[in-house]
Amino acid sequence: MYPSDLRLSMPRRGLLTLAGAFSLLAVTGCGSDRSSTGSTTTETASAGSFPVVIRHALGSTTIKQAPQRIVTIGQGATEALISMGVYPVGVETYAWGADKDGHLPWNREAFEKAGRPLPALFAGGEQLDVEAIAELEPDLILAPWSGLTQKQYDQLTAFCPTVAYEKSAWTTTWDGEIRMVAKALGRPSDGDKVISDLKKTLADTAAQHPHWEATTFSYIYTEGQGTLGIFRPTEQRVALISMLGLTVDPIVDTITANDGSDWALISLENADKLKDSDLIFTFHLDAATKKQVTSQKLYSSIPAIKRDSVVAPTDPQLVTAISMINPLTVPWSLPRLTDLIDQAVAKVTD
């Protein structure tokens, strides 16, 4: 299981066949009139910005005019849209890190602050609810950081232009995702500003904690007995911590990643590779999993684990927030994250 699956969760409804998707097109009529209350956009691009063509891993998508009813799949696209004044009509639901209704807290706060109706929710992941998406009558589907399959993409493009990830599932960089979203809106310069502002926020935080700069770290996860997962420097969790001024343990670059991914699995017998990491960042799905993992002798022998210079939040909302870099999750999570890092760094120097 890829570690980002913890974001996706819940039992899902079965996929429609491609033929079913075509029949949905006839039933829902994506081009039908909608009332003005259905518009997702507070700021639109000029007509001269279109058409826009976006090439991605699953195909090439042409967006003929400024989209008004956008649906998002995966993570990060919703937040990127909101940062540019655009509110999607439908988003993938979350069981881990979301509130009781399935909304991520920072997204709910943004919709409510803007006086916008909350978006419709639908099942994602392997059981992507194509029918529910079609019923929303979208004119654009954005999935730039997702696990969308070719089959799912073909089903969606039967009734709506769909943008997938650049190269492979769950590997789009945080700034690459923002640029893809901005391009789809016909507003690339707005995306550049969002990226610039976000970099400044993180750089300012790093400047306030100069003692972090000499601190090395590894970002790991475990799924049970015998294995250890290590996130690569390009993975968004790791990139976030690096942008705060900490240094990825050089050993991470020597560990071969799984094909087409930004993470690697090693045997716990090789856990001593992390002996020079000052800090360990990780997460646990629940208390039982944490107990199982930390009770393993090889795991607990990692120096950072032994001295407890570990950043391992247990709040699902915080864990989800710091698993990505975007203009909503960063300000929402940064105060709590910086406190946790300070506590862990103090244990290195004790």
Predicted stretch roles:
Residues 72, 76-81, 191-252:
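Basic- and aromatic-lined ligand-binding clefts that recognize polyanionic substrates
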Residues 78-130:
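A short, structured surface patch at a secondary-structure boundary
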Residues 60, 151-225, 323-350:
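Extracytoplasmic substrate-binding proteins
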Residues 274-350:
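Structured C-terminal subdomain patch of bacterial secreted/periplasmic proteins
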Residues 96-102, 148-151, 167-180, 214-241, ...:
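Extracytoplasmic ligand-binding site segments that recognize negatively charged/polar headgroups
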Residues 30-41:
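Bacterial lipoprotein signal-peptidase II cleavage site
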Residues 1-10, 14-28:
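N-terminal secretory signal peptides
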Residues 137-143, 161, 276-277:
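Proline-aspartate-enriched helix->loop->beta-strand connector
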